[in-house]
Amino acid sequence: GSLGTFFHDMCDFFGMEEYFIRMYTDPQVVHAATDRLVDFYVEANDRFFREAGDSFDIFLIVNDLLTQRDLFMSLEQFRTFILPGFKRLIEVGKKYGKTIMLHSCGSIYRVIPDLIDAGVDILHPIQAMAAHMDAETLAREFGRDLAFCGGVDTQDKLVNWSPAQIREEVLRLRDVFGGNLIVSASHEEILPNIPIENMIAMARAAKE
């Protein structure tokens, strides 16, 4: 299962700035539009899960809500307009026994407790250079409740470090996160500016 990108859709529909303004000026309109979008994603994924059965394990929910410093919005806005949609999507995934992976680039640190309470099992992509998203902080504060996918920095380290340094970084991350890490780049894809040798070094270190 995949996506449920209702936040992105709302930004496209209203325009991002207008969307955030309407959270204050026309909250009932924002709620109504969000509910219709989430209705669609809940129904679409419910049908997909019903037909697909046990052919896959993970429901990936994708919504980029963040900068490298914090949320695009206030915590109150997140809990009022975004979190209820997440909970509905998570509920349909759990109904079919799926593991819930949430994707959101940037510093999602401030709302991780809300996501854990909502039922998120895996956090992706662990943007390593974003505020409070270092491995030590995440493992210490949330390692008992979450698995992590990502963490190998694609903004600097994978681009500029040597393969030997990348190997050491992967081994360090594995040590910090223990068994709760799926080794991956810190974004959802590996960009062309990353040397192939470093990609190979990351993959090999993950298998050691």
Regions found by a protein language model. Give the residues of each.
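Active-site loop segments of alpha/beta catalytic cores
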Residues: 1-208
